A protein has these predicted regions:
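Beta-strand segments within the central parallel beta-sheet cores of soluble alpha/beta enzyme folds
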Residues: 73-74, 139-141, 182-190, 211-214, ...
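Phosphate/ATP-binding catalytic cores across multiple sugar-kinase/actin-like superfamilies
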Residues: 53-60, 219, 285-308, 354, ...
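Glycine-rich phosphate-binding/hydrolytic loop that grips phosphoryl groups
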Residues: 218-225, 274-275, 287, 318-319, ...
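N-terminal glycine/serine-rich phosphate-binding loop of ATP-dependent small-molecule kinases
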Residues: 1-87, 91, 136, 202-214, ...
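Glycine-rich phosphate-binding loops at beta-strand->alpha-helix junctions
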Residues: 17, 189-197, 307-330
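Gly/Ser/Thr-rich active-site cleft segment
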Residues: 13-15, 110-217
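A short glycine/serine-rich beta->alpha loop
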Residues: 108-115, 134-136, 207-211, 264-271, ...
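Glycine-rich phosphate-binding loop of actin/hexokinase-like ATP-binding domains
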Residues: 82-105, 137, 141-171, 210-284
Length: 366
């Protein structure tokens, strides 16, 4: 078997389905599939993720002309900030309206740095809504890290880049909010080797004993998979919700824009978010996309930055040919070309890229 048949099994945990793909070293997607969850709104939906993975392994098809792939590793990403207890009890990222930390004049300065944390409000919400489970669980995981733990027994939290700490938490701020510091697994870096699949999981899934590589947030996997990691690149991640993401070399903050670090040191990502995009009427949806692009374009002009002429799209909406054509035609009127990258599910490509990078630079489980 040729070395080119070596693959990473990339896994992305979505809101309603699990996606899987076989990704080669050069980023080629040999095959991919999607497995819907039987009850995506069930409070214990996370318990079904490993069963969806098993179904994906059985379902994923390899073209007859190709040799059987040699799976070298699994790479896992998923939606966030979904939270899961060890029992599988799940607080999904989109269940409740976005909430902010309650800060006042008595709040210590170190906590104020976390005013825009993505995870802390959800952790506090979990504690308040499901207090018994919060107390009983040894660990509280982000979504993809729960599956990593199931597969390897290793409890981790993926911190995409050191500057992301204020979007997550640190020991001091957890203590300040009365959250046991040991309940949130320790941070590991993007591409961390969580260790091999356990023997039981190898047998259950029908997979070889290979390492599980931590990718973490699907947001990060999507940016990597679309190449939105260089200044002046932009992508449109459009599934059940939508985010237009612009990579820049300046930290720019503005109303209506979420500013987060890029995984590339020194760069930043500006996001305009459209919650529940897929459920909006098409005309309303497209006008929100146009407004988001115009906002980012204005910020670029105000800060002396060139705005790109091409946007790479990914996600479920990219698979709807009629909608994609309508959106592309509208953006052409703005002088912008809308394209699809290697595949419509760029998160899988990003997972593969992270895993292959980790395999080229081996690191023992930490």
């Amino acid at each position: 078997m040729s070395e080119s048949r070596d693959c990473v099994l990339a896994i992305d945990i979505g809101t309603t389905a699990l996606k899987a793909g076989l990704i080669t070293k050069n980023g080629e997607v040999i095959s991919m599939c999607s497995v819907p969850y039987s009850a995506p709104e069930n409070r214990f939906v996370a318990e079904g993720w490993i069963w969806a993975l098993k179904a994906a392994v059985e379902k994923i098809a390899v073209p007859e002309a190709l040799e059987a792939p040699h799976i070298k590793a699994l790479a896992i990403s998923g939606n966030g900030p979904t939270l899961v207890s060890e029992s599988g009890l799940t607080l999904r990222w989109n269940e409740y309206p976005a909430c902010a930390l309650s800060l006042d004049e008595t709040t210590p300065d170190e906590a104020r740095e976390f005013a825009h944390s993505i995870f802390l409000p959800r952790i506090l919400l979990f504690r308040d809504l499901i207090s018994d489970e919060f107390e009983q669980t040894t660990h509280l995981f982000s979504g993809p890290e729960y599956l990593m733990w199931q597969l390897t027994g290793k409890a981790v939290t993926v911190l995409p880049e050191p500057r992301y700490e204020t979007a997550y938490w640190n020991r001091e701020v957890l203590e300040g909010f009365g959250i046991p510091t040991g309940k949130l697994p320790d941070f590991v870096e993007l591409g961390h080797n969580c260790g091999d699949l356990t023997d039981n999981n190898c047998e259950f899934l029908g997979l070889p004993k290979v390492p599980v590589i931590a990718v973490g947030p699907d947001f990060i996997a999507g940016l990597i998979g679309t190449g939105t990691t260089k200044a002046g690149t932009i992508c449109d991640r459009a599934g059940s919700s939508e985010g237009i993401n612009f990579c820049v070399d300046k930290e720019i903050r503005a109303e209506g824009v979420r500013t987060l670090p890029c995984v590339t040191a020194g760069l930043w990502n500006l996001s305009v978010l459209i919650p529940n995009s897929a459920s909006l009427p098409e005309d309303q949806r497209i006008e929100k996309v146009v407004a988001g692009i115009e906002l980012l374009k204005t910020l670029a002009e105000q800060n002396g930055l060139a705005f790109p002429k091409q946007i790479t799209t990914t996600g479920g909406q990219a698979k709807d040919e009629a909608w994609f054509g309508k959106k592309r035609a509208r953006l052409e009127q703005m002088g912008i070309e809308l394209v699809v990258g290697t595949c419509e599910d760029a998160e899988l490509v990003g997972d593969g890229a992270v895993a292959w990078s980790a395999l080229r630079e081996p690191q023992g489980p930490q």
